[in-house]
Structure formats: C-alpha cells, structure tokens
Amino acid sequence: MREGRAVAVVLLSGALAAATAHGPARAADLPIFDAHIHYSHDAVDQLPPKEAAAVLRKAGVTRALVSSSNDEGTQKLLAEAPEIIIPELRPYRTRADTSGWTREEGVVVYVEERLKKYKYVAIGEFHLYGADADLPIPRRMVELAKQYGLMLHAHSDADAVERLYKQWPEARILWAHSGFERPERVREMLKKHPTLVADLAFRTDHASGGKPNPEWRELFIEFPDRFMVGTDTYVPERWYFVPEHAKWSREWLKDLPPDVAEKIAYKNGEAVFGAAWARKK
C-alpha cells in the first residue's frame, strides 16, 4: 500500500512538473474545455487543490467539468479555481457507490442534501446500464435533475440512455465516453436524440498519428456541436495525463476544419456548460 502511494505521489509530482515545463498554452494552441475531470478524496490527499489547479492552467485547460467521490473534492477545487471549475454532482459518497448506488437509499438522501446546499450544472458522472436505469433510485435522480434543471452525465450503454430519455424526453444528456460505442452507433444516437452530447474521455480509437480516424472524422464534421474532449481522472494517477491529453487532443483537432476543431476543443463545452453555470450564479 505504501509503495503504491509513493508511486502515485511521484506521478502526481510529475504531472505538475510536466505542466510547468509546457508553460501556458501558446496563442496558437486551442484552449481546452475538459468535460470529464474527477477530483476525488484520494486525489485531494495527494494533489492539493492549488497544485491541481496549476496542472489545469499550465495544460491550457480553461474550463473543466468536475465531479468527485465525494463532492467535497469538487467544492475545494471550485473554491481554488472558480474561473476554471464547473461543478456537477456525482451521486457517490465513496468509491464503493460506483457499483451499488442504484440500490442504495442513502444515495438519494446524499444527492438531495447536496442539491440544497450547492449549485451544479449536472448530476453525474454516474455508472448506469440497461434496465437498472428503471430502478427507483435512478428514477428519483432523474426527477431531481428535472426539478433543478440539471443535465445528466451518464457512463452508460445505449440501452440505459434510451431508458433515461423515456423517463424524461426533454433531458439533456452528456454521454460519457460516447458509451464506448463504435462511431456508427454514436451517429444513430445523436440523430435520434437532439439533446444528446458526447464526451470522448478515456478512449483513443477516434484519432491516431495526429489525425482523426476516418469514421470519426465524418462524425465530427456531421455533428460539430455535439462532441467534447475529456481526460477522465478517475484515479489520482490520471492527473499525470491531463497535460498530455490536452496536447494530444490539440494535435488531432488541428487536422479538422478550424471551426469544427474549436467547437470540440472548447466552444461546445462553453455553450452547454459554461452558459448553464453562468445562469446558476
């Protein structure tokens, strides 16, 4: 355990050093809206808020959609960098809720309490698959999102996304990792649901060698307003990749038409979440 923690600390120190080495994003670089950042309790312990904010700034991440297990991490990072952080509420009190939250009554109480105390733009990111979307606790979560005017950030298969829309046809959903689906399936879902947007976090199949792969390129050009990039710092060590992910994203985005690249890099995130957060203040 101590050895693993030591490795994590070294990696996180490397994250800050790498970010500083890159320096602020050059004018020619695209700003990045990172739509998939977590700052959970173990990350807070290993990378204090001031250092985490420095990683984001030096990587040229001008805005980040942040959720955490538990929410205290998000609130600490928001207090440190309010010009960057846009908060969403993850329905997890601890990491243990990742797999069992859909059947844990205490999750509802937790979400209700946090919504009364703080402001958010979305509920998520949450893990939800298939028919579990129709269980009472996920249904209550959807009701709360509707009540508070929040988006849903779903780490879900297409089936669960469909079930969420059946419960709330007007829902606005950010589909985490684009469901890890192939581009043709993502296309089907985007065509069917005009309020569905997709993040590309924790996947690399959409680009290689500094260029989008052909099927994904077609999809990005067909739906330029519906995609966002994201790192997914689901464990503390992933913070090491925030600068590298931003750099890698800029490389393949620059192969797209400039207006499309700008939308996916940061304008879509600003239009969807930046605008929503401005209304909450």
Over which residues does each language-model region extend?
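Mid-to-C-terminal alpha-helical segments outside catalytic/metal-binding sites
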Residues: 5, 23-26, 30-33, 50-67, ...
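Bacterial N-terminal signal peptides
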Residues: 7-21
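Short, well-ordered coil/turn segments that N-cap beta-strands
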Residues: 29-31, 35, 60-64, 81-87, ...
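Di-metal (Zn2+ and/or Mg2+/Mn2+) metal-binding site signature of metallo-dependent hydrolases
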Residues: 31-45
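Active-site metal-binding loops of divalent metal-dependent hydrolases
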Residues: 37, 126, 178, 231-233
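Active-site environment of divalent metal-dependent phosphoester hydrolases
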Residues: 40-42, 71-74, 94-96, 129-132, ...
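Active-site gating/metal-coordination segments in enzymes
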Residues: 72-151, 197, 202-205
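Catalytic pocket-lining loop regions of alpha/beta-barrel enzymes
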Residues: 89, 132-229, 276-281
